[in-house]
Regions:
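Negatively charged, low-complexity tracts enriched in Asp/Glu with abundant Ser/Thr
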Residues: 2-72
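Short, charged/polar micro-motifs that form catalytic or ligand-binding hotspots
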Residues: 16, 77, 105-108
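Short, compact, well-ordered microdomains
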Residues: 86-131
Length: 131
């Protein structure tokens, strides 16, 4: 059966000043999180552990990522990167905030937030923090 599917509305392009403001606030947040989330492994530790926290832009999304080390002898690669939080630019200097669920699906909890509101939620809510 065929049905009409209207064209999707184009995503808002992120202005450079907004990108710079988000990147700056993210770096401050990640600096505060690094001592708490990046710990040296104990000798003989065989499980994945966080070695770096970073942020990156892709189209109209800003992702917070954790780089994990894989020390075990059966590891497929020595490192991998996992995204754990996402800010989606929706226009008018507003963002939707989502976290990565253990199933690999993004769960959007908050919509239409300002940059300051986004980073307040990131600081306060454990959903958005690396595991």
């Amino acid at each position: 059966m065929w049905i009409y599917s209207p064209p999707k509305r184009p995503k808002s392009k992120v202005p450079e000043d907004v990108k710079a403001a988000v990147t700056k606030q993210a770096e401050h947040l990640l600096e505060a999180w690094r001592p708490r989330h990046i710990k040296p492994p104990t000798p003989g530790y065989q499980f994945n552990y966080i070695v770096e926290l970073c942020g990156t832009w892709f189209r109209s999304y800003f992702y917070l990522c954790a780089k994990y080390a894989c020390p075990g002898p059966t590891a497929l690669s020595p490192f991998f990167e996992a995204r754990f939080a996402r800010l989606e630019y929706v226009g008018d200097r507003r963002f939707n905030l989502a976290f990565m669920r253990h199933t690999g699906q993004w769960v959007e909890l908050e919509q239409g937030l300002t940059i300051d509101q986004c980073f307040t939620s990131l600081r306060e809510e454990s959903f958005y923090q690396p595991a």
